Amino acid sequence: LTKLNNDIYQHEKGLGENDRVYLVAASIIATLGIPGKVAPLEKEELKSLEEEGNTDGDIILRKIKAFLKEKQLPQAKKDLIIRTLQNTLTAENINKAENGESQLKRVFAKIVDDLGIYYKIGLTTDFTGKLFNEMYGWLGFSQDKLNDVVLTPSYVATLLVKLARVDKDSYVWDF
């Protein structure tokens, strides 16, 4: 993860801290897929076109929307995720083709090549926690190394919801 961040930082100009985090998140969501419902996005599907509605960012965004729809999340949550990722994914500068390839396609390919195997063999809470911790460190305000992300397995979170008698759909319980 550190190598991926450094590689993107050094070789992909014009991407800020938030952009790198959003691109990793978007790439992971787009490549997860849902068996029998949403096919995972493959690198070859990104064509680096500058045609309106068919840029690499548009393709990734459509795949994310299909994934979120099948996950049956509340509409407000889907809208929040899309709004957060959309500005980065549809920015003209990262969708502009240079030497036949957009910056977005290059970054997407790096992310899939570096992280894809972990998701293909089965996403684990431990790996996801490490991913969140690493990406949190990419952000400029995260100087405090004592902060850490802890992911609770869903069965434990469900038990805690029942014990605490809170709304399980609260954003506090998202991860």
Language-model-detected regions and their locations in the chain:
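Accessory nucleic-acid engagement/destabilization modules that flank
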Residues: 1-49
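Generic structural signal for alpha-helix starts
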Residues: 16, 70-74, 153
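Amphipathic alpha-helical interaction segments
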Residues: 19-27, 110, 126, 130, ...
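Long recognition/docking surfaces used for binding and targeting
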Residues: 29, 33-140
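Active-site-adjacent structural elements in folded domains
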Residues: 142-146
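Conserved S-adenosyl-L-methionine
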Residues: 147, 152-175
